[in-house]
């Protein structure tokens, strides 16, 4: 690729997790530079960003827009190499008090996992802020939400085994400390002021910026949890079809997995408050991306969009430089006021792409971002739902045909209303539940044709759609009856 030949660089992670082997690009040796922390086993694949990486050597020539496009294009891979990457977040809490756990408790859990289960530590400013093992990583969201970014795996059986192994490890370490983990989409009991702040430079920048661009950004950062799946594409055309399908159906997934009905101890008026929060977090970098449905859409159009999303930061010398509101286009010509003369590397571009939060996000794979966090069976069901739809040609074509005449207004209406009314949201001459039934059947058919006996992972989805009762409505019913209008029992109900 033309990009590689112009970079004399070594990738170095802040944790020292650079690949410790010699590699050649066009005859030029590129040596990864190790640092003190961690043994840096493995990198790559469809996993979420750990702390940002940086290039050890300055750029010799400016990046071009073609380089930025080539980065995305490099994600194209043949079907036999498609993988499934699952990420989920959860709230840690003290079992005795139900209070959110503080950073020092989280640090002890991370250290315990590292010692007992052989994870490598990721350190920032002498604070342990994550773990890595092979192609899996554990990271901390701004309020201490504990995230597993799974390895790219071939089957849903492997995905579910990975989730179960992780939950077992976290439970084993946490229980000894009187700490539990909760699978829900929004913090049900505690106020923003009760949530601890993690010692990560990136989050400090975001925390200061969020109130300037939306009213709910701090809630998004500190009080939400999600589960998402990352999926591959074979070509630009395949990416476009999957991107459009993912955006059109994201509100349907939001309805099926709606699981955030409480806020500060009482019902909040939504089935998925987490989903609603994204509608007023920062509309420059979130939403339903109507341009994806334009005939002209492709990798280049997404690059143009991403270039226009205001920056958050540049990462240099293990420090974050606040560049909030600045333009990546200015950065490309060395005109960032905060870093004059500094030119971006591909790693800066990679980092910038992680600061964009639409309902479906394009990196070198596609991320489905519409579902609330939930109990472990739903952590297996969410990737199953999307794999059945997007990794089977027949199902993908059926869904593409089914959604091809949906208008931007209809997609936006679903995006706005589903967080409130879930499966009962009217759509054309029926309801979202009717759509969900049809889509579920296509997902089941797609999984059947894959031939890995994966359809069983959709049982949770089947139960929700056949009953018409979302997880959130089930919790609200318990709140009004068995729980006697207290949210405290949810910590036991949805304990991992």
Curated annotation (Swiss-Prot):
Location, primary (coarse class): plastid
Gene Ontology biological process terms, A to Z: glutathione biosynthetic process
EC number, UniProt record: 6.3.2.2
Catalytic reaction equation(s): L-cysteine + L-glutamate + ATP = gamma-L-glutamyl-L-cysteine + ADP + phosphate + H(+)
A GO term for molecular function: ATP binding
Entry keyword annotation includes Nucleotide-binding: yes
Record-linked Gene3D superfamilies: 3.30.590.20
Keyword list, A-Z: ATP-binding, Chloroplast, Disulfide bond, Glutathione biosynthesis, Ligase, Nucleotide-binding, Plastid, Transit peptide
Compositionally biased region (Low complexity): 29-38
GO CC, alphabetical: chloroplast
Region (Disordered): 14-53
Modification comment: The Cys-160-Cys-380 disulfide bridge is known to modulate the enzyme activity according to the redox status. The oxidized form constitutes the active enzyme.
Transit peptide: 1-34
Family, per entry: Belongs to the carboxylate-amine ligase family. Glutamate--cysteine ligase type 2 subfamily.
Quaternary assembly: Homodimer or monomer when oxidized or reduced, respectively.
Protein name according to UniProt: Glutamate--cysteine ligase B, chloroplastic
């Amino acid at each position: 690729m033309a990009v590689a030949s112009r970079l004399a660089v070594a990738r170095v992670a802040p944790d020292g997790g650079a690949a410790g082997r010699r590699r050649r690009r066009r005859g030029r040796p590129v040596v990864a530079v190790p640092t003190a922390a961690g043994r840096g086993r493995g990198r790559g694949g469809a996993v979420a960003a750990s702390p940002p990486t940086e290039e050890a050597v300055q750029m010799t020539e400016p990046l071009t827009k073609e380089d930025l496009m080539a980065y995305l294009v490099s994600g194209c891979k043949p079907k036999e190499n498609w993988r499934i990457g699952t990420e989920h977040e959860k709230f840690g809490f003290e079992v005795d008090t139900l209070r959110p756990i503080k950073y020092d408790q989280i640090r002890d859990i991370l250290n315990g996992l590292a010692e007992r289960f052989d994870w490598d530590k990721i350190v920032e400013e002498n604070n342990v802020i994550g773990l890595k093992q092979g192609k899996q990583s554990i990271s901390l969201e701004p309020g201490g939400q504990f995230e597993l970014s799974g390895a790219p795996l071939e089957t849903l059986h492997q995905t579910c085994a990975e989730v179960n192994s992780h939950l077992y490890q976290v439970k084993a370490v946490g229980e000894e400390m009187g700490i539990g983990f909760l699978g829900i989409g929004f913090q049900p009991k505690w106020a923003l002021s009760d949530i601890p702040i993690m010692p990560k430079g990136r989050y400090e920048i975001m925390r200061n910026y969020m109130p300037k661009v939306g009213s709910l950004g701090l809630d998004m950062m500190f009080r939400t949890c999600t589960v998402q799946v990352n999926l591959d594409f074979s070509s630009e055309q395949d990416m476009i079809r999957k991107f459009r399908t993912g955006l059109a159906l994201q509100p349907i997934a939001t309805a099926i997995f709606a699981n955030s009905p409480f806020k500060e101890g009482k019902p909040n008026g939504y089935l998925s408050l987490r989903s609603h929060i994204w509608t007023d977090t920062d509309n420059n970098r979130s939403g339903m991306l109507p341009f994806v449905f334009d005939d002209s859409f492709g990798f280049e159009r997404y690059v143009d969009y991403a270039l226009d999303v205001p920056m958050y930061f540049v990462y240099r010398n293990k420090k974050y430089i606040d560049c909030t509101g600045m333009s990546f286009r200015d950065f490309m010509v060395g005109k960032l006021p905060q870093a004059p003369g500094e030119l971006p590397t591909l790693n800066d571009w990679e980092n910038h792409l992680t600061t964009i939060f639409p309902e479906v996000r394009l990196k070198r794979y596609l991320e489905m971002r519409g579902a609330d966090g939930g109990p472990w069976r739903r952590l297996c069901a969410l990737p199953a739902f999307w794999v059945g739809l997007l990794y089977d040609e027949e199902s993908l074509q059926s869904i593409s045909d089914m959604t091809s005449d949906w208008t931007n207004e209809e997609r936006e209406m679903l995006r706005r209303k589903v967080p409130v009314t879930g499966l009962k949201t009217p759509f054309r001459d029926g309801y979202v539940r009717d759509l969900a039934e049809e889509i579920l059947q296509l997902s089941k058919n797609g999984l059947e044709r894959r031939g890995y006996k994966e359809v069983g992972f959709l049982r949770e989805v089947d139960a929700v759609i056949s009953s018409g009762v979302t997880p959130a409505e089930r919790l609200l019913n318990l709140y009004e009856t068995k729980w006697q209008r207290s949210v405290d029992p949810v910590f036991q109900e949805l304990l991992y």
